């Protein structure tokens, strides 16, 4: 995920930002040049080089809390999450109300799977900067992972109010609405996501799953078929089709879809099908038992 701050500073042209430093020092101070280079390099996905520039800035000015946050984001982009948290903590020690550092710390903790702590820090981020749509989005995502769907719906609504083109926010809001069994609202929200990103296979999958919960099995199968057109290597879509066919007591189609599922992902879905109530109507059939109990496809 590319952060709002870095999207803003990526106006620097990379080729200009990494020009010979001594020639540029006449117009800007060395710290400004290095910071600009680091921001541009981050925006270009050159995170290690960005880290080097930010490190040089911090040698010159170890109290620059903004650069400590930039340093933290660069570390997070390199999956060095514990080190990134150290950088965000240094930023916050200097400026405790700096929203971007709270945001970064929460994001890093979420990446490490610490969703409770992540939600705590992301809440601080949106308190200090309520217009940070990415922070609202990341807060909602953490709340989804915690099963706090009512809270996450509110967070995604804030995120969408700031950026109405963020299909990820619509998608995750749809997931949360399913979590509280508001399936009609979920379907409308997923339609908005698909309007913005019609080839997002995972949104079609979620739409299909929602339609199954609504008992609209034919439409669900059509959604999974659309998903497969967008992404062929897509076991979740085949599994969704198997569920919908099973609810219609269509043994042959169920077995065909499960076969395709197990070819693509033989272990996880074989465990899931053993516990999935959608298949209970076919579970005692000998052919079904042979399919789910076969050790290998």
Predicted feature locations:
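TPR/TPR-like (Sel1-like) alpha-helical repeat modules
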Residues: 246, 251-268, 296-297
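Terminal, low-structured helical/coil segments at or just beyond the last alpha-helical repeat
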Residues: 3, 12, 16-23, 28, ...
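Conserved alpha-helical positions within TPR/SEL1-like repeat arrays
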Residues: 35-43, 66-77, 100-111, 133-145, ...
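Canonical positions in the second alpha-helix
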Residues: 24, 57, 90-91, 124-125, ...
